[in-house]
Regions:
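Selective transmembrane helix interface/packing segments
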Residues: 2-594
């Protein structure tokens, strides 16, 4: 019992660390993306000027180290974790696709460098002769589909075992060779350089800004309340971070239990809809019966932080910003809570993990509560106090709102808390409306594409692979919702204060009340409808999964086309000053360095 308690505590600490790192790192990426987007729209230098200079030997080690670690991991899986015969096909498909992916990705990256830098050796000359690196990408896609088609077509034939064995060995070989070749090429290409500058597309710039704020002066106005002035950033920062604790980021991991109650090996396969009760590790920090109430209770304390900052700063602009922030957050939290009442009526629980389980067995919440999703999304953007709802910090009206008298690390905590709030709201929307870790037709024993009683395709998958795919799906859904909130910032102008209040109290609040009424009537009609209605709703749920799957495939194809499409920059001379500068020959610009 003591061992199990210690293990549970260590797992709690590990899961909390993973959730905190996920929220904070995504917030850093959002900061970077926000600045990059602003630089592209305003045609100015973006956050790619922060450079970390490191010795060449260290850079070569950074190139070879991860590659050797990946190779060691692959060798361990191949040599120590021999798959049973029924799992050989799935593992062969996985490694063959990974090997093909790493091969063409390495070729595209090196080919792009050669096109920009020029030819330095015979290998560069061969890559240069291929022309546009996009050709390597298109060839890689063709090989992906060819390997997938051959594997599925010959899996149950007389040559199935040979195909699985060849695919497994070839995939492992391609993966190891491509990773090692790419790392070796990077290490050799920088040999002889005195030092190497790491930019990482500007991702180092937010880190440099964070370090800079630590050493800045911590200014406190002379007549300010020093205790409350220092307390306010912490009251805003930590609640935004800990609300992620109730959001599951993956399905349950199931382990075998020993005779003494200790955890054994991971279960390899699971029945379709079964749930393990013993030896289960939930990918969720805390599983509360009132998880949704916990989220809103802690998220609402951010109002206190904004109000304290405005009151304690001894500044009229800060006070106005604090009052605006408090009124705005209170107004839109009412709408956020009411929009989820309909979802709670449908799911019949306040536990977030059970909401996801309901969606995995029926349909995603966005199909069950479409109006609630859009209302909640709008209210969550307003709750995060970002454009077009950044009334509390409107620069043209009240300088910087309740941020005015803050500097250094305290200002950074306020600033960072806003981006973390974007991540947490996106995670909650993903769990309640987009199925969380659930993906269409992916069950606990594998992939089963069925419409009604018709089975179209099925493929058994290992338990660990299904859990990892689900966790990756949750991360992608959260990132997409964060990206949508980021795009709104650079698309819509700021509302006036009266427009903001009118939207919340006269538009969103009545719509959320109407949604609660409509949901109650529809739920009563379905419950009393009998077996025919239940069968019809089940068929609609299958069609909704098919729609999501097709939309996901279409979105992936569009994203790939967007990435490989040549960029054509077009300036829009909207202002008279821009037109005058263009007529005079343009403005001088140069890459900045830090």
């Amino acid at each position: 019992m003591m061992t199990l308690t210690l293990v549970s505590f260590l797992l709690f600490v590990l899961k909390a660390f993973v959730v905190v790192m996920f929220a904070m790192n995504v917030a850093v990426i959002l900061t970077w993306a926000d600045r990059r987007q602003g630089a592209m729209i305003q045609d100015r230098v973006g956050p790619n000027r922060a450079v970390a200079w490191i010795p060449t030997k260290v850079a070569q080690g950074l190139a070879l180290g991860p590659a050797l670690a990946v190779i060691a991991g692959v060798a361990f899986v191949v040599l120590k974790l021999e798959p049973p015969p029924e799992e050989l096909g799935a593992r062969a498909m996985l490694f063959s696709q990974l090997g093909i992916f790493c091969t063409w990705l390495t070729g595209v990256v090196i080919g792009g460098k050669v096109q920009n830098r020029g030819v330095t050796n015979s290998f560069d000359a061969w890559l240069y002769s291929l022309g546009d690196p996009r050709r390597i990408f298109y060839g890689g896609l063709f090989v992906h589909f060819l390997a997938l088609f051959v594997g599925l077509a010959l899996n149950d034939s007389a040559y199935g075992e040979q195909v699985r064995t060849i695919g497994y060995g070839t995939g492992v070989g391609l993966l190891v060779l491509s990773v090692l070749a790419g790392a070796a090429y990077a290490a050799i290409s920088i040999n002889g350089e005195p030092r190497i500058g790491l930019r990482l597309a500007g991702l180092l710039h937010p880190a440099a800004d964070g370090l800079k704020t630590i050493f800045k002066e911590d200014f406190i106005p002379p007549n300010a309340d020093k205790f409350l002035h220092s307390l306010a950033p912490f009251v805003s920062f930590f609640p935004a971070l800990v609300v992620m604790a109730v959001i599951p980021f993956g399905d349950t991991l199931c382990f075998e239990l020993g005779k003494d109650g200790s955890f054994g090996s991971l279960i390899t396969t699971m029945p379709g809809r079964a749930m393990c009760t013993e030896g289960a590790i939930r990918l969720q920090v805390v599983d509360l019966d009132v998880g949704l109430l916990y989220f809103f209770a802690l998220a609402g304390t951010g109002i206190v932080g904004a109000a304290l900052a405005g009151w304690a700063s001894d500044n009229k602009y800060s006070l106005l910003g604090g009052v605006r922030a408090a009124s705005q957050m209170v107004s839109y939290e009412v709408t956020m809570g009411l929009t989820l009442v309909g979802a709670v009526m449908v799911y019949g629980t306040l536990r977030v993990d059970q909401m996801i389980e309901w969606q995995s067995q029926n349909a995603w919440g966005i199909f069950v509560q479409p109006l609630a999703f859009f209302l909640f999304f709008t209210a969550s953007v307003a709750e995060s106090k970002r454009i077009p709802f950044d009334i509390p910090e409107g620069e043209s009206e009240i300088v910087a709102g309740y941020f005015t008298e803050y500097a250094g690390m305290k200002f950074a905590m306020f600033f960072f808390a806003e981006y973390i709030a974007v991540v947490t709201s996106a995670g909650l929307m993903s769990a309640i409306f987009l199925g969380g870790w659930d993906l269409p037709f992916l069950y606990r024993d594998g992939l089963h594409v069925t419409i009604g009683q018709t089975l179209i395709f099925e493929q058994a998958l290992p338990h660990l692979a299904i859990v990892l795919i689900g966790a990756l799906g949750f991360v992608l859904k959260t990132l997409v919702l964060c990206w949508l909130q980021l795009m709104i910032r650079w698309t819509l102008p700021r509302f006036r204060y009266d427009q903001l209040m009118r939207l919340g109290w006269r538009k969103l609040l009545p719509a959320s009340l109407a949604n609660v009424l409509a949901t109650g009537l529809i739920v009563m009609a379905i419950v009393t409808g009998g077996p025919a209605v239940a069968t019809f709703m089940s068929l609609l749920a299958d069609y909704s999964k098919a729609l999501v799957a097709l939309a996901g495939i279409g979105g992936f194809i569009y994203f790939i086309v967007f990435l490989v499409k040549p960029v054509h920059k077009r300036k829009s001379l909207a202002s008279t000053s821009a037109q005058f500068a263009h007529a005079a020959g343009g403005t001088r610009s140069a890459r900045m360095s830090a």
